[in-house]
Regions:
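Central cavity-lining transmembrane alpha-helices of secondary-active solute carriers
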Residues: 64-77, 260-269
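C-terminal transmembrane helical hairpin of 12-TM major facilitator-type secondary transporters
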Residues: 283-328
Length: 400
């Protein structure tokens, strides 16, 4: 009997379950479309703020409100733990499609912000469902490779998704970019709904019993690390598009080209992390990524006037972020092994707070000083993240 071949077989051998190898590629593509919708706005904030006739810092304040509202993420994690994994993932994707449609059709900035908020909430439900699905099917020691594979969707969402949406925006408007994203993610929601087994792991009695378990105290070091890591990412991601437009005269098409290059950097980091994190160790790999962010941010504070140097440093900065986040996710999902959704939800709440703070601080600092101050703040955040991971390692008996 001929063994069925799957796309993921290039990365996962027979020691991984057939269920994992059969579906991980589909779920990765689904997450690519969700990440494209989620990541689309920041590079084009200048165009969006112009359309609504408001300043960049005011739009940053509006985005901060959406991030603060995402403080409900630990509750969402507990809720998702009770759902069928297929329900959480397919439902999350279809909800993202609806939210992106709201953003595309928004008549005012506050309706736009509502759409962005709903995209974030729905994406969170999908991501928690995916992380829990991986926990259900893959042993912890092998989880880094599978999560690394699914996490390539973060980079590909930028490389393929945001680039395509940006090119549509350059030919029409940013609203049609969202429309394309909404259609793509809806298609993948239907694919996930039809391909995954309906009886796949649900919020069984086991899950309902164990979600009451508390986060271990040392797990809050990972909460802090996620706060600093996401803050470091957000401070540049919400400002680099405006920097390119103001400093070097980039158009939406030019920014899309830069987004493509940054996505390639992130993809390199994702693939490398997927191959190396389980071997190097998750904590060590997370620190390695932050160790790239720190010098890149500091050098960008002085090299931001040179287009080539600035773009290279920006690429290294985001490469370090991607390597760190991929390495930290399996660590986060295992903090409460019997309730991965709740543990990951608490940690991602830290990331939400980090993004919220820098949505306001980063855009306000850019409006007043330019890109150099946000870059410096990002470097300091990377140092804070390294400190949190070191502290976690010292309070954890066994590190994997």
């Amino acid at each position: 009997m001929t063994k069925e071949k799957y796309l993921a077989d290039r990365f996962l051998d027979d020691t991984y379950s057939e269920e994992t190898r059969r579906h991980v590629s589909t779920l990765t593509i689904g997450r690519l479309t969700s990440n494209a919708c989620f990541r689309y706005a920041p590079p084009f904030l200048a165009s969006i703020s112009d359309d609504f006739n408001i300043s960049l810092s005011r739009l940053g304040l509006a985005l901060m409100v959406t991030e603060i509202a995402m403080g409900i993420s630990p509750l969402l994690g507990r809720f998702v733990d009770r759902l069928h994994r297929r329900t959480a993932m397919a439902g999350g994707l279809l909800a993202i499609s609806g939210a992106a449609t709201i953003a595309a059709a928004s008549p005012s900035v506050w309706i736009f912000v509502l759409g962005i908020l709903l995209i974030a909430v729905a994406k969170f439900i999908f991501d928690i469902g995916l992380a829990s699905w991986v926990n259900d099917h893959v042993e912890y020691e092998k989880r880094g490779r599978v999560i690394g594979l699914t996490e390539t969707s973060w980079a590909l969402g930028l490389l393929v998704g945001v680039t395509a949406m940006g090119l549509v925006a350059s030919a029409t408007s940013w609203r049609w970019g969202y429309a394309v994203g909404a259609l793509s993610v809806a298609i993948m929601g239907l694919v996930v709904m039809t391909r995954l087994d309906g009886h796949d792991v649900a919020g069984s009695q086991r899950s309902r019993d164990t979600v009451k378990h508390k986060m271990p105290l040392n797990g809050y070091w990972i909460f802090g690390a996620m706060f600093f890591l996401m803050a470091a990412s957000q401070t540049l991601f919400v400002t680099f598009g405006s920097w390119l437009e103001d400093e070097f005269g980039f158009t939406e098409a030019g920014i899309s080209a830069v987004v493509f290059g940054l996505g390639a950097f992130e993809l390199l980091a994702s693939v490398t992390s997927a191959r190396r994190t389980d071997t190097w160790g998750k904590e060590r790999s997370t620190i390695f990524g932050a160790a790239l962010i720190l010098p890149a941010g500091l050098l960008l504070t002085v090299g931001h006037n040179n287009q080539v140097v600035g773009l290279i440093l920006l690429g290294i900065y985001l490469l370090g972020f991607e390597f760190s986040i991929v390495s930290m996710l399996p660590l986060s999902a295992n903090l409460i092994p019997s309730s991965p959704g709740r543990g990951l939800g608490i940690v991602l709440a830290g990331g939400t707070l980090g993004r919220a703070s820098m949505s306001l601080i980063g855009t306000a600092a850019y409006d007043k000083f330019g890109i150099n101050v946000p870059a410096f703040i990002g470097a300091i955040c990377a140092a804070g993240m390294i400190g949190c991971i070191v502290a976690y390692g010292r309070t954890t008996p066994s590190n994997v």
